[in-house]
Swiss-Prot record:
Binding-site list for ATP: 302-309
Subunit: Homodimer; homodimerizes via its N-terminus. Found in a multi-helicase-TICAM1 complex at least composed of DHX36, DDX1, DDX21 and TICAM1; this complex exists in resting cells with or without poly(I:C) RNA ligand stimulation. Interacts (via C-terminus) with TICAM1 (via TIR domain). Interacts with DHX36 (via C-terminus); this interaction serves as bridges to TICAM1. Interacts (via C-terminus) with DDX1 (via B30.2/SPRY domain); this interaction serves as bridges to TICAM1.
Gene expressing this chain: Ddx21
Name of the protein in its database record: Nucleolar RNA helicase 2
Sequence repeats: 117-153, 154-190, 191-227, 807-811, 817-823, 829-833
Region of interest (3 X 37 AA tandem repeats), residue spans: 117-227
Subcellular locations according to the entry: Nucleus, Nucleolus; Nucleus, Nucleoplasm; Cytoplasm, Cytosol; Mitochondrion
PANTHER family: ATP-DEPENDENT RNA HELICASE RHLE-RELATED, NUCLEOLAR RNA HELICASE 2-A
Reactions catalysed according to its record: ATP + H2O = ADP + phosphate + H(+)
Start-end of Basic and acidic residues biased regions: 26-42, 99-113, 133-145, 170-182, 207-223, 246-257
Polar residues bias spans: 226-237
GO cellular component, one term: nucleoplasm
Source organism of this protein record: Mus musculus
Motif (DEAD box): 411-414
């Protein structure tokens, strides 16, 4: 009967002989013992409980319940076991008694034969190996076989029996064939003789049947149990349902909240939005949509690059298109959008035009002819975007009617209500607004920066029930979180050259960079500086409007890579793929820094903003850090290695763009050059020339001064003072080092110093210096972390005749800025007299910081 054990008496001689054939050799047993020795303690309690529970039940063909002896120790069992009437069994038993008891127990545990398994049992996975030294059954001749997962008539107690471990493939085992009830490797009853030689099927993956005849066998659960065929379809469907639920979980919350189906947006508008690459509403758009659509006044604040323009454009267009009346010629605008710059006004107008084909959108700003704008007003306008100056001109000339306004938007409201525009905005809005009237147009104010005074000024234009949406709130960081903020200390005389190196490393020839300057003159000069290898154009107020539009369009299209601009490009401009923003000096107000840095890192992209500063601008930089809630990472100028590496990458990219037809014309020259110089030398020279890096100046990593190399002297202990480093330098390099080192400052934790030396002195210093357990001298490849910002040079650059005042000057000037020399000193920062007793002159704090 399938699933039942036969008694040892009924096994017969054939079974015994077969068992003898399948017994493994002692060496094989020993090998298995060694492999499982480390696992002998895992299932001791479970196996003992299994033995005791199974000892209470017997096969119908085996001995009765009364004949079952209680479980005994392995030694006692071996002594009491007696051979059955089968001769083969007797000989086998006597042979096994000669083996050590431990090996006998192991063979009884692992080497078992099986009775005919059912189809379900044959399909089950192979069990794990049993622990060495633990018998899988009690008295083998008297007890039922150990089952897996309760199959083959399990009792309640048997269901809890731990699963035996897998036997090795191809190792047929048997206990005492005549005495013990044989077991399968998977815990089932013994198979027929034909089945013994059948190779075991390979392990199948979960959900796959081990047997090829799928129609006859039930599917397996993960735990190896068989299952009725009906639920099979359900189990196959489960992975699909699970994967679909996982897909839903993977959708970000922002996309779920911003799905178009959550808002009353027409299909036509959705198609136009998708054409612009907008597949869902951004957080600021989703949170303001219903306020704008329902006609409520609103003040909204969100970081740069988060999509504020569409926050008011989409709901206003849907509202106007929903109540669209007859399009009369000469109709007055219903929506007025005011922007601080011409470039921003032009961009907002384009955003409106891109998502509506039914409404008329016009843009009025200075620098363009009046005639075309007057003609647009005669034709009729639904949405008017413009700058305050030109809108005011049309009002004063009586050409523009704003009495029909229903919606007014002030983009970059903090600048629109500031002193520069406040009077013009007041004059424009007083035409459509009445004091304390509920019939005033809906007022919408948007910006990335909203100081407290903005709310006070804005209240006179807004209803008392206005809404406020602030996605920045009390968060410390006001600037874009997708932008990395870096700072480089550099004197203004070195600034242009260092900016050129920075662009090479952080943007390259293929990237786009915006450089912000404080004045129009600086912007014009920097755009024409030869240190900037990439094509550069300037954008400022003195450039004619037509040229400004051409320049901005060319930069958007990638016709040139560097745009040098004043604040006209700081606000609102959405220029794609700007990799780097450079600010030539800290701005006067933190709002300008936030808007400038926001030209990169837009719409989920990341970007870098680098701010240059001098000693006297440390205070301004700290103010930006405090108010913008950011922390600048102070870095040194790009090293020669970094510049060359970046330049070579750019040159290789340029090689990829050369067409094959052009290459064929240069093959003969290339072959000749390779013969003369060699392939590597020739190609390296070509790459250097293409990249423009034929000569790279070494620069100080402390203050960016050309012709200097920064070196680091590390100490294994904390240094009490800076003279501790000077003493070690003089001991190894001699007194002459006094004239070669300058700008020495502590490293973080005072575990060393860094200083500058002239480029030509580096090799000499490296040859003379010998590292010790306490001191190690290296050339810096990047700016080290300093104990504090260096307060200018206090070094020992002076001569013995008294010219060391500013740099350190123990004999030729003091260690402070004013160079209080004891024997004179002509090289301090403040000194006026070339010799003797130069004490410099005092300066006030405000003068020192240019305030």
């Amino acid at each position: 009967m399938p699933g039942k054990l036969r008694s040892g008496a009924k096994l017969g001689s054939d079974g015994a002989e077969e068992s003898m054939e399948t017994l493994p050799k002692p060496s094989e047993k020993k090998t298995r013992k060694e492999k499982t020795k480390s696992k002998t303690e895992e299932a001791t309690e479970g196996m003992e409980e299994a033995v005791s529970s199974k000892a209470k039940k017997t096969n119908k063909k085996g001995p009765s319940e009364d004949d079952v002896d209680p479980p005994k120790s392995r030694k006692a069992k071996k002594q009491e076991e007696e051979p059955q009437d089968d001769t083969a069994s007797t000989s086998k038993t006597s042979k096994k008694k000669k083996e050590p008891l431990e090996k006998q127990a192991d063979s009884e545990t692992k080497e078992i034969i099986t009775e005919e398994p059912s189809e379900e049992e044959a399909d089950m996975p192979k069990p794990k190996k049993m622990k060495k030294g633990k018998e899988a059954n009690g008295d083998a001749g008297e007890k039922s076989p150990k089952l897996k997962n309760g199959l083959s008539q399990p009792s309640e107690e048997e269901a809890d029996i731990p699963k035996p471990k897998k036997m090795k493939k191809g190792k047929e085992a048997n206990g005492d064939a005549g005495e013990k009830s044989p077991k399968l490797k998977n815990g089932l009853s013994q198979p027929s003789e034909e089945e013994v030689d059948i190779p075991k099927p390979k392990k199948m993956k979960k959900g796959k049947e081990a047997s090829g005849d799928a129609g006859e066998k039930s599917p397996r659960l993960k735990d190896g149990l068989s299952q009725p065929s009906e639920p099979k379809s359900n189990s196959s469907d489960a992975p699909g349902e699970e994967s679909s639920s996982e897909t839903e979980k993977e959708i970000p919350v922002e996309q779920k909240e911003g799905a178009f189906s959550n808002f009353p947006i027409s299909e036509e508008t959705v198609k136009l939005l998708k054409a612009r690459g907008v597949n869902f509403l951004f957080p600021i758009q989703a949170k303001t949509f219903h306020h704008v659509y329902s006609g409520k006044d609103l003040i909204a604040q969100a970081r740069t690059g988060t999509g504020k323009t569409f926050s008011f454009a989409i709901p206003l267009i849907e509202k106007l298109q929903g109540g669209l009346q007859e399009r009369k010629r000469g109709r007055a605008p219903q929506v007025l959008v005011l922007a601080p710059t011409r470039e921003l006004a032009n961009q907002v107008s384009k955003d409106f035009s891109d998502i509506t084909k039914k409404l008329s959108v016009a843009c009025f700003y200075g620098g363009t002819p009046y005639g075309g704008q007057i003609e647009r007003m005669r034709s009729g306008i639904d949405i008017l975007v413009g700058t305050p100056g030109r809108i005011k001109d049309h009002l004063q000339n009586g050409k523009l009617d704003l009495t029909k306004l229903k919606h007014v938007v002030l983009d970059e409201v903090d600048q629109m209500l500031d002193m520069g525009f406040a009077d013009q905005v007041e004059e424009i809005l007083c035409v459509a607004y009445k004091k304390d009237s509920e019939d005033n147009p809906q007022t919408l104010l948007f910006s990335a920066t909203c100081p407290h005074w903005v709310f006070n000024v804005a209240k006179k234009y807004m209803k008392s029930t206005y809404e406020q949406v602030d996605l920045i709130g009390k968060k410390t960081q006001k600037a874009a979180i997708t932008v990395e903020h870096l700072a480089i200390k550099c004197h203004w005389t070195e600034r242009a050259a260092v900016i050129g190196d920075v662009i090479r490393v952080y943007s390259g020839h293929q990237g786009r960079t915006i450089i912000f300057c404080e004045t129009k003159k600086d912007a014009q000069e920097l755009s024409q500086n030869t240190c900037i290898k990439q094509d550069a154009q300037s954008l400022h107020g003195d450039i004619p409007q037509k040229q400004r539009e051409i320049t901005l369009k060319g930069f958007r299209n990638g016709n040139f890579g560097v745009l040098v601009a004043t604040n006209v490009a700081a606000r609102g401009l959405d220029i794609p793929e700007v990799d780097l923003v450079v600010q030539s000096c800290p701005p006067k107000d933190v709002e300008s820094y936030i808007h400038r840095s926001g030209r990169t890192g837009r719409a989920g992209r990341t970007g870098v903003c680098i701010c240059f500063y001098q000693n006297k601008e440390e205070y301004q930089l700290a103010q930006v850090e405090q108010k913008a809630g950011i922390k600048f990472k102070r870095i040194g100028v790009p090293s020669a290695t970094e510049i060359i590496k970046a330049s070579s990458k750019d040159a290789i990219r340029l090689l990829d763009s050369v067409p094959p037809t052009a290459i064929s014309h240069f093959k003969q020259s290339a072959e000749k050059l390779i013969e003369e110089k060699g392939a590597v030398e020739a190609l390296a020279a070509a790459l250097a020339h293409i990249s423009g890096a034929t000569s790279v100046d070494q620069r100080s990593l402390i203050n960016s001064q050309a012709g200097f190399v920064t070196m680091i002297l590390r100490c294994s202990i904390e240094m009490p003072n800076i003279s501790y480093a000077w003493k070690e330098l003089k001991e190894q390099l001699g007194e002459s080092i006094d004239a070669k080192v300058k700008g020495m400052v502590f490293l973080k934790g005072k575990l060393g110093v860094c200083f500058d030396v002239r480029t030509e002195a580096v090799t000499e210093i490296q040859e003379k210096w010998h590292d010790s357990r306490r001191w190690q001298l290296t050339v810096a490849t990047e700016q080290p972390e300093l104990e504090g910002p260096p307060d200018g040079y206090r070094g020992r650059m002076g001569q013995r005749d008294g010219s060391r005042g500013a740099f350190r000057g123990q004999r030729g000037g003091s260690r402070n800025f004013r160079g209080q020399g004891q024997r004179g000193g002509s090289r301090n920062f403040r000194g006026q007299r070339p010799g003797g007793g130069n004490r410099g002159q005092k300066r006030s704090f405000s003068k020192a910081f240019g305030q």
